[in-house]
Amino acid sequence: MPICIQNELPVKNKLLEEGVVVIEENRAKNQDIRPLKILILNLMPKKEETERQLLRLLGNSPLQITVEFLHMTSHIAKNTAQSYLEKFYKTFDEVKDKYYDGLIITGAPVEQLEFEDVNYWGELNSIFEWSKTHVFSTLNICWAAQASLYYHFGVKKEQVADKIFGVFEHDVLIENHTLTRGFTDTFLAPHSRHTRIEEEKLPTISELDVLAKSEEVGTLIAATKDFRKIFVTGHIEYDANTLHNEYVRDKNSNLPIEVPVNYYPGNDDTKVPKNRWRGVAYLFYHNWLNQVYQQTPYDLTELGK
């Protein structure tokens, strides 16, 4: 089934070129279908790149999905024109009276700051709290996973000596869980972060299941038992060249950065990296949307009751 996005969203043509099925909002409004409503809070600097990565995965579902984008008003974007945000993004004030089947909160390049020092922390707290009564399932990615675990459960983050950067092997810990159904017993996924969560605290949280974990870099996927909060500490949505672009950026800026682990063929950064996690990404998002579809109420206003 197609994914419904704004008619003039620039990434639409790129998605069509990739074979992603897209339906324009004008046509979708004339169909007698209750699509899943997904809101994406995009905190990444390169908005269009992240839009494309997530829409590609959402568009692989057999379900019809309507997507809206959200940005923070308490933060001035440095890499995206305000006119672009005003045209294609909503503010929290514009969506706070609405209800959504799912909310995706992306990572953000602020992980080396204390949570309370992030300039939009107060606004994000309001969104976390609002999501309890207005969103069925919230998927938190990378820094957002750390922030959400901290807000909801008091799990702190810790600085690591060397950046967790590369493609790591993970083990599925709970067989046949709805989010990891169809995964191989071990699988690869990218990470790119300077911090880790308090791993030792996760087993003490009775509402939480750890679903996939790496011996090298810790938890990748966790979820509350009621499916309302999902946490992914890595970046399974990344393109094949995203880690490469981050590596080149930091190298050119003379920042301390090592070659991404297990990423380039032969560990040679002159060779083209391969995407070895694409299947996992598609399957994970398919599983998430499928469970949202099955469990969310038809009348979303029931979430607040």
Cite the ranges covered by each PLM segment.
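Flexible, glycine-rich phosphate/dinucleotide-binding loops
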Residues: 47, 76, 112, 147, ...
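N-terminal beta-loop-helix "entrance" segment that forms/cooperates
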Residues: 73-86
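Helical hinge/lid and interdomain linker segments adjacent to catalytic or ligand-binding clefts
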Residues: 85, 89-92, 108, 115
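Short, glycine/acidic-enriched capping/hinge loops at junctions between secondary-structure elements
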Residues: 50-53, 79-82, 115-116
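Cysteine-nucleophile active-site neighborhood
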Residues: 105-174
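Amide-donor transfer/coupling interface in amidating biosynthetic enzymes
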Residues: 1-72, 89, 95, 99, ...
